[in-house]
Amino acid sequence: MLILVSPAKTLDFEQPPLTQVYSQPDFLTHSQELIQVCRQLTPSDISTLMKVSDKIAGLNAARFGQWQPGFSLDNAKQAIFAFRGDVYTGFDADSLSEDEIAQTQSQLRILSGLYGLLRPLDLIMPYRLEMGTALSNPKGKNLYEFWGDTLTQAVNEALAESGSDIIVNLASNEYFKAIKPKKLQGQLISPVFKDCKNGQYKVISFFAKRARGMMARYIITNKVNTLAELKAFNLAGYYYSEEQSSPTNPTFLREEQ
């Protein structure tokens, strides 16, 4: 199985990574193109474009200015240890064994507005550039047009290398829109997580994000290879619901917390 997840806005570049093993992102030439565009933006432009505070806009203007290729553990960090936030809290990379980290490297891919498609051990420098950002660039009016078919092709290549034909989409809609499902060369599965609130099952963003991270970890640590094995996911009180599921959207429910 090849797993797709979103990145996180929250970053941790303070704690040292758990391994000295790293790889370099595949699309740094593309990233440099975007950085050149972003460097032309003032903090005020960034604040308006990204809908962030002046403080965050200033921080990211500085990050764009400091960004440079030639990543090492001195100026960058592996993506899986740098990203924090709900999905990554659920995934809990810090407690993986060396073998599980190696498995994660081959089985997990992180969609990114700036870096395109990241392997977990790819080094990244701090940034904020969400996939849904309407950033005009030489290839179009937003990042979806900038990346075009590139990320879909990269996912197909990663899927072929994995030896599987199942793609488990645990990314948000904003990020998965960078992929063209009809061009994927495998079976696409997009799990849904619903929590009971006031007697009704619904997707609650905070819980669903954590559940996506937990499922990604579950696939890796349990060496899940089939849809039947995926349906056995039962962490944090979730259970598979045949009634609420469809062939491409296995649905997991949890009672009120």
From Swiss-Prot:
Gene Ontology CC terms: cytosol
Record InterPro entries: YaaA
A biological process from GO: response to hydroperoxide
One Pfam family this sequence matches: H2O2_YaaD
Family: Belongs to the UPF0246 family.
Protein name as annotated: UPF0246 protein Shew185_1115
